[in-house]
Structure formats: structure tokens, C-alpha cells
Amino acid sequence: MATAAPPSLSLCYASSSFQYQQDPSFQTHFKPLLLNSSLCRLTLNQRERSCLKWVDFTSQKQSPKSVSFRVLAAVAAEAEVADMEEEEGESGGVATLPSPTKPKKGKAALPLKSDRTRSKRFLEIQKLREIKQEYDLKTALSLMKQMSSTKFVETAEAHFRLNIDPKYNDQQLRATVSLPKGTGKTVKIAVLAQGDKIDEAKAAGADIVGGEELIEQIKGGFMDFDKLIATSDMMAKVASLGRILGPRGLMPTPKAGTVTPNVAQAVEEFKKGKVEFRVDKTGIVHIPFGKLNFEEEDLLINLFATIKSVETNKPTGAKGVYWKSAHISSSMGPSIRLNIREMLDYKPPSNA
């Protein structure tokens, strides 16, 4: 007895259109494929067991025997088909593969500070203070001096995180502060001037004084100075040094007090301890305020002067809370967090 031929189907390549030609009650149920799968020609097999997870064809006719078909799509050997329908069913999303992670380069590839190996010296001195504790100015300075263990005299540094964004002109901060007790180091000053200003600069204690000949020396690579001061009438010629002095932070500017008609006063101020500071792109100001061999009272006076200068020169575009955090540290030591309220309310002694 001849058996009846199975119903015919019309199939195509990697397509979502399957057409049953004879029985309209024939239903298809599609399940997601990986996006990087490559399909070959589809083959049709008649099986009595359950279908695979790609495409199911089931006849809904009321017949004694249900007819099930399984359509098997051949994929590349390396492709793995994942059952994502249950995960994406509720949200109705489409299953996608995560994009491959690109390897990090440069500073981004470095481990986090918490994952780096600290020296034994650093780990020992770090135990002297609590990490999240906020200290008043006097206690913080005392701890900073206790945690100094290097073979050289470290610099005391203040680090203030401010609620400003320097990419906006009205939120930039660049100013100077005169430290009453000095910086603790010798500053070598060069002056660009002409005429009588040259004699005034030499009398005030400038280390290097010159005019156009000094400009030519700087173009030739001469950089043996820490600060460059220029008179206003020399700025047209100094402009040609922008590419050389700018990246080093030595370009004279009025905001820094290095472009002035009174060169003698400027030389004296920088010799005594005038420090220039500016906010970096992350909104943090870094200011040195002395050496660790200073007395605590002298460091306190200098630190108070830096705080007052940052507060006085608050940008006009700063909004909300201006001070976000404040820390002090030595050059090679851990930072000590300051209590901002006590820091701003501190009143120096009248004899300071």
C-alpha cells in the first residue's frame, strides 16, 4: 500500500519567509538566531520527536496523528546558538552579542591605585592617620610632619577640589598668593626689559636680565630660570616664545603678576615667596606652601594664606558649594583630609 506523500513546503535561504502551500492551519514559530550566523540551504526532515530551537512547523489539523517537522539550518562550525528567547521574552528585546572589549592603552591600562603595590614605608606611615577622618588644620599639619620619612626635605602641598569647570571662561581660576613665611627654596628669576628697567631689575635681585638678546637665547634652548618676568613694552617680542614657554608654564601673563611695569616690586615678591596657582582640567588646585622643616606655626600661616587666596579669587561663574574637598600632603606622603567647615572658620592668631 502506497504511503501518502508529505505536504510540500516552499523554503528559501536565510530568510524569515516560509510558505506552506496546501494547509493554511500550518503554523510557524521563529526563534532568534545569532547575528553572526551564516546559513546554508535549509533541509527538511520528518521526525516524531520535538523540534530544534530555530524554526518549528506544527500542523494544527484534528487528525489522529500530528505531523511534526524539524527544519535544520546549517551554521558555521564555530558559531554557537544560545537559547535567548526566555531571557528576552518579557522585555521584548532582540538578542544581540556584546561588542568585543578593546584593550586599554596608556594610563588607562595601569591598575587602580588601590590595586598597586605600595612600598613598606608608605604602608607604615599611612597607619598614623585614618583614611576617611577629617582633621582640623593644626592636627593635619602635625600628622603631615610625623609621616615624613624620606632622606630629603619634602615640600608641603595643598590640594583643593573646587566645584568649577575650567572649560568655561567664567569658571577659570588663575591667581597668585604671597606666602608670609616663604616657600623654603631659592627662586631663580629672569627679567625681559629694556632701558632703565634693566637697572631696576638688577638692583631688586633678578638673576638674569636682558632684552632681545635674552629672547634669542631662550629660542636657542636656554631655560635656566624658574620664573620669567617681562615689562609691558616687551610683550610684542615675547609673543614669539609662546610655543617654548607655554607648555612649561613660564609664559609671562598679567594674571600671574609676571607682566608688570614695576619689575623691581615683582622680583622682590617672587623672591620672598609669591606663588602662582591655577586650576587643572579636573577642577583641582595644587599649591605648595612651604617645606616640612618649617615650624608648624609657619606652615599654618602659609596654609591659611593659600586658603584665603583661593576663596578671594572665586570665579564669578562658580555655582553652588564652592569647596568640595581639601587635602594636604608632603611630596612623598599620603594625603590628609581637612574639615572644610573648620578650615574656612579658622581665625589666625592676632600676632601671626
Swiss-Prot record:
It comes from Spinacia oleracea (Spinach). Residues 82-113 are annotated as: Disordered. Keywords: Chloroplast, Plastid, Ribonucleoprotein, Ribosomal protein, RNA-binding, rRNA-binding, Transit peptide. The keyword RNA-binding applies. It is found in: Plastid, Chloroplast. Belongs to the universal ribosomal protein uL1 family. Residues 1-72 form a transit peptide. The keyword Plastid applies. InterPro entries: Ribosom_uL1_bac-type (IPR005878), Ribosomal_uL1-like (IPR023674), Ribosomal_uL1/biogenesis (IPR028364), Ribosomal_uL1_3-a/b-sand (IPR016095), Ribosomal_uL1_CS (IPR023673). GO terms for molecular function: rRNA binding; structural constituent of ribosome. Gene3D superfamilies: 3.30.190.20, 3.40.50.790. Pfam families: Ribosomal_L1. HAMAP family: Ribosomal_uL1_B. This is Large ribosomal subunit protein uL1c. SUPFAM superfamilies: Ribosomal protein L1.
